[in-house]
Amino acid sequence: MSYIEELGEKAKIASKKLLTLDTKTKNRALLAIADELINKKDEIKAANKIDLENGKASGLSFALLDRLELTDSRIEGMAQSLREIAAFVDPIGEILTGWNHKNGMSIAKKRVPLGVIGMIYESRPNVTIDSAGLSIKSSNAVILRGSSNAINSNIYLNKLFNKVGEKAGLPKNSVQLIEKTDRKLVKEMITLDKFIDVLIPRGGKGLKKFIIENATIPVIETGAGVCHVFVDESADIEMALPIIENAKTQRPSTCNSIETVLVHRKIAEKILPELTEMLLKDKVELRYSEEAYKIVKNTDFGHKENLKLATEEDFGAEYLDMIMSLKLVDNVEEAIEYINEHGTHHSDSIMTKNIDNAEKFLNEVDSAAVYLNVSTRFSDGGEFGFGGEIGISTQKLHARGPMGLRELTTTKYVIRGNGQIRE
């Protein structure tokens, strides 16, 4: 039996034990792990520092280094996420609906775990804790395959989770990390349908494409984040500017940050000078369509070397960095058509006072989350009140949008009777 098969077999055994684990034990374990994350903050940062130094030496981009870094506040956020997950109602065992058959038997639809989750993700070590916490609360076993860039951070976090969790009553091997960084193991993992029930990839287009094309296990696709803001003709500019700034610059390496702004032509000359100045001050590289570029090219801005003409490749690109494209459109219909063609069905926002345009945008943009006068940065399990998320699904089957506890469950029918047979 191979290394991956051994992990799979252990996970399957653990998943059966998790079926009978009571809510009190799960919550006790999650709270104890949260406390230990705070207690071991320095040790976590020491392991993370090794990954950061290795990343810098190998030439990782600013965006990837940002995703990799664990600061005090991010560790505290991981602990808080576990506390929130512990506070949620346990979804397992919930009766969604029920009725009595005319022959006297009862039929109930009950929420149950998925079983064994295979989680494949890149760079962000906080995903290790979020994924483990959500899996445990939903009574799923999980096999984690993080990025080689974060291997030291992930190993430390996984050992901490298991040491404290098992002491609090979690079944052994409920959470396992693939500690070997050989990429060939991913191919083996995604074909381990004997033991793994579902795969959830979080990462770039290349990773997801490889998994979707090669997996023999059902995949819940968490999409790339080519997110947009459309500034309509009636937009409140004073409101729109800080929303765009937040959506682009607060944490550009995340999938819910925007990559492209669409501006209504009739408002372009009014908003572009101020928008351009603001984002150049923030050191964002701006890639404007030719028409937009002409409006501001003769204006005196600081950091003007970062104002550039866009190419066709910029529209639809996921930068995950301090880079943003911008183009002009004639109306809300054109904005919707553009977003549906160039976006990734993740999160998109409209800035407008026009109720009809707002409703049209919210109804017709084919994305997991659509916003009116709000930053796309709120597409997040924590912000939606889920405690954390195991990913943001951009597909339509099983789950869509931030995936919390309920999205890690399925259902079964429980029928009770006293000797009924079908005639």
Where are these regions (language model features)?
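N-terminal Rossmann-like NAD(P)+-binding subdomain of aldehyde/semialdehyde dehydrogenases
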Residues: M1-I107
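ALDH superfamily catalytic-core signature
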Residues: S2, K10, S123, D130-S138, ...
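Flexible, glycine/charged-enriched surface loops at secondary-structure junctions
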Residues: T23-K24, I92, A168-V175, Q250-S257, ...
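C-terminal core of ALDH-fold dehydrogenases
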Residues: R28, V332, E337-R422
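Rossmann-like NAD(P) dinucleotide-binding subdomain of oxidoreductase/dehydrogenase enzymes
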Residues: A87, L96-E238
